[in-house]
């Protein structure tokens, strides 16, 4: 894996939020999927981390955002944790995957990845978290990759074009969207390999 992406480990991330502004709007859910590589050089989704997150103090939450995601903040089974706890757990898992794969840093993979990376970086700054394993500004965007591979930029349509089952009723859950984005990313990279677009020159 370390040689496939120049020492970077792809980690798929999706966030659900209280709006579009990472500085002022609440982070409500975050999920991350680490990516593995088999002995033939093909990628696969490896491990999922998921947390519902308590809005930080003073966070803005737009009613339209809750309506869009279907998140119910007062649901008795929501069992949300603090931003710090959620990020610390995910970072711990990512660092473990980095070590296992011989990679030096994680690179965020997301569908419209700048949005997810912006909220991740804002949570890191708010909580003064050290040892953030993610590259601070580089990312892989599956909206771009899917546009190239399938002519589709919407996640559901891209998955359908890639023959990945996608249930619209489950969409806008960070866990579901992250796992589907991980399948999409692995599928595109693996398809490129099958077409001869990448070879392991150490073979």
Swiss-Prot record:
Annotated site location: Important for substrate binding and specificity = 20, 68, 115, 137
The record places the active site at 172
Provide a GO CC annotation, any one. Answer: cytosol
InterPro entries documented for this protein = Exonuclease_RNaseT/DNA_pol3 (IPR013520), RNase_T (IPR005987), RNaseH-like_sf (IPR012337), RNaseH_sf (IPR036397)
**Cofactor(s) essential for the protein:** Mg(2+)
Residues covered by the Exonuclease domain: 11-185
Q: How many cofactors are bound and how?
A: Binds two Mg(2+) per subunit. The active form of the enzyme binds two Mg(2+) ions in its active site. The first Mg(2+) forms only one salt bridge with the protein.
Output the GO biological process annotations, alphabetical, semicolon-separated: DNA replication proofreading; tRNA processing
Q: Which SMART domains match?
A: EXOIII (SM00479)
What is the uppermost EC class here? hydrolase
The record's section on CDD domains has: RNaseT (cd06134)
Q: Which domain of life is it from?
A: Bacteria
| Cross-referenced Pfam families | RNase_T
The residues that hold Mg(2+) 1 are 14
Residues bound to Mg(2+) 2: 14, 16, 172, 177
The molecular function terms of the Gene Ontology recorded here are:
3'-5' exonuclease activity; magnesium ion binding; nucleic acid binding; RNA exonuclease activity, producing 5'-phosphomonoesters
Q: Kindly state which keywords UniProt assigns to this record, in alphabetical order.
A: Exonuclease, Hydrolase, Magnesium, Metal-binding, Nuclease, tRNA processing
Annotated EC: 3.1.13.-
Looking up PANTHER family in the UniProt record yields: DNA POLYMERASE III SUBUNIT EPSILON, RIBONUCLEASE T
Name the protein family: Belongs to the RNase T family.
Q: Sum up the protein's function in the record's words.
A: Trims short 3' overhangs of a variety of RNA species, leaving a one or two nucleotide 3' overhang. Responsible for the end-turnover of tRNA: specifically removes the terminal AMP residue from uncharged tRNA (tRNA-C-C-A). Also appears to be involved in tRNA biosynthesis.
What is the protein's given name? Answer: Ribonuclease T
